[in-house]
Amino acid sequence: KRCVAIPGDKLEIIDGLLYINNELSKLPYRAKPLFKYRVTSQNGISSKELLKLNITGFSRKFKISGINSNQQFEAIRPYISSLISSDIENFIITSGHKGIPSRIIAENRLRVTEIKEREKIISMTNSDFEKLESKKTFDSIYRIFKTTKSYNTSFFPNDIMYDWNEDNFGPIIIPQKGQEIELNKQTLP
């Protein structure tokens, strides 16, 4: 976390980008904000290829055959992000970018096949995006952000009157000494 505005500034987030006093904020060179991208490929997206590029903000989908005991399930449980199908013959899970360790697969005599998805949502930095785009192996890569106006009580001022979210927020004015605000139904959050 860092200070991005000072008293008297107007702060606003538009399409995931920070604006201070109506100007796009220039982040320090060390700042590496993550954005969500939708990546598509008719040939499927290789997790191994993403990992070679040191891109890790994605999930993987696996089909697991041969699960016939609680012991096997308990062995892979720590690596499961979500369970898509619990059918013994068609057991499908998602995991983090590291997947399921080969040692766990071998010890439990599981048959694990990664499902090569045609679309992935990937969290990555601008430099990761440039690396991925330069590969020319994907049909499309585009940044996604919340554009629909729907209120979210997780975000200040936690009021249905404001349709703010993590990608579109504000504007708000950072109070400064001596500033006066008329208190009424519109100015009280």
Predicted regions mapped to residue ranges:
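Soluble "head" domains of membrane/secretory-pathway proteins
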Residues: K1-P189
